[in-house]
């Protein structure tokens, strides 16, 4: 309907029930007024002013709106709703222009907000189909800047600034808000198309009809000023839902990337790439706008963030996503033996898969073992909706979960599974841990357990909480327990100098308050503490053993010599070197080694790295009776190096530490991964 050079311009102005002016549309308030005027560009004539009052769904006007517009709530009760008001607008413009074959018109607004931030978002929420004329428009501010480059900055430009630049006198003809702006815009347009400017309105702004999916290469250069992060999305939302939330703004092709958590499930965040910085800035104004009943937070992000989620290099994925305008559905929970024929039979004739077998992409681990996930292409929305109705139907003996997916999610899932499994396979331990000769009796209840601590509690808070009993804590005797996410669990264990002092501390400190929370204090033994720190649970019904103590359904596939108590390097990096070199086992000194599979649970609970005055031993690492001894380096420290070049040698590492004090007897321990190394350093603890 819109030609490159239209015959008519329709000046359009909107008013909302909330903020107006530069903040128009930022508060999600509904439209309450439409004003427009038709301008004949060929004859340079301005038509009559038209005005329609619109009844919003929520008849509430802000005080600012009432003051500026002089509109009262009573004026809106008999007004038409937005859909009827837009029909009146379309019919009025058509009648006035007497549109025939070859006649064209285009909307013209003061800035981007009226169309992009008001009409399109509200119409999308109310499922109103906007006329085609609202998908292209002229931004009078931009056109004015092209015609008059010496005018004010576009961010400071408005109707009054443009009128002042052209020397118009201020009019007082209209008292209704918006009417004077429409009059001034008409005069400005007529002036621009007349002598001496003779400006032609061409190449209008475009609003995308729909979001286009696509792929993104990791090698692509992306402008940081075009990326936002949306947070708080419903877990079932798709890229189309994101595009609908940002309706009116142009998202780049394939520019909506849903983020996944460590388990491969959506975490409620998405990274969105827009076509320009201007559209990104408008998107930021939708911070805390609503998607259904949830408000969405919108923040700036970087191109690097986007590439981590949406970027990919797999030719298989690129070929799978090469078919455009396809709806992607993700299947989860497939039998590991499922074939493409079984997937096609699962969907049946009601929802045919695009391209048959070529429209199915199975997700596999690096060794080609199936993960139970697959992505399927459908040619249209109808087929996809029919497919989603099969959610939790059976394929074989397993029920299948179905979700709408995106091209970016395909890339992300394939990248995640092809690079490494979600749960790393256990690796052989490599760091010897020397046991301390002293082993405390397990039946002595010389420990106390604090339960219900504030999550922000520190060791200093605990010492203050215990008061006089803090003097009875063993050296390095405070154990802060972390959960499997590495965050404080609200529990702590304290080793006291005697069972009597532990008993008195439990009696006098039980249910005392710490930062407005009462804390429970129980007397316990070293054995009970050891069980909890290994991942077991301690409750009033007794001890629940940690995962690594549960009966094995099948023996481990491999074992390692039990020459020394050992921990994996991933766990070792969490602790101070003194903890690794001077351990104290709370287990009997019988030779013991947990199978490699048990190491998966070692981080279920962990020590908080304590300063001097807290524990110096790792009680849940079992010790062997016949361990070969080595002089402890009490003043040394362990350094872990990550990210080394694969061709790095010992000389390169020693040169790197030039200037630090290390002695020839310091140990250099290679790790299985060639890009890692450990160096014992006598003075400092450095993590690289």
Swiss-Prot record:
Q: What the protein does?
A: mRNA splicing factor that regulates the formation of epithelial cell-specific isoforms. Specifically regulates the expression of FGFR2-IIIb, an epithelial cell-specific isoform of fgfr2. Acts by directly binding specific sequences in mRNAs. Binds the GU-rich sequence motifs in the ISE/ISS-3, a cis-element regulatory region present in the mRNA of fgfr2.
Q: Which InterPro entries match?
A: ESRP, ESRP1_RRM1, Nucleotide-bd_a/b_plait_sf, RBD_domain_sf, RNaseH-like_sf, RNaseH_sf, RRM_dom
Q: Which family does it belong to?
A: Belongs to the ESRP family.
In the record, biological process GO terms are:
mRNA processing; regulation of RNA splicing; RNA splicing
The residue stretches assigned to a coiled coil in this entry are none
- Note the superkingdom of the native organism: Eukaryota
RRM domain location: 226-303, 327-407, 446-526
Where in or outside the cell is it found? Nucleus
Major subcellular location class: nucleus
Gene of origin?
A: esrp1
- Organism in which the protein naturally occurs: Xenopus laevis
GO CC annotation: nucleoplasm; nucleus; ribonucleoprotein complex
Write the record's keywords in alphabetical order, separated by commas.
mRNA processing, mRNA splicing, Nucleus, Repeat, RNA-binding
Q: Which residues form the signal peptide?
A: none
Please state what the protein is called: Epithelial splicing regulatory protein 1
Citing just one GO molecular function, the answer is: mRNA binding
Record flagged with keyword Nucleus: yes
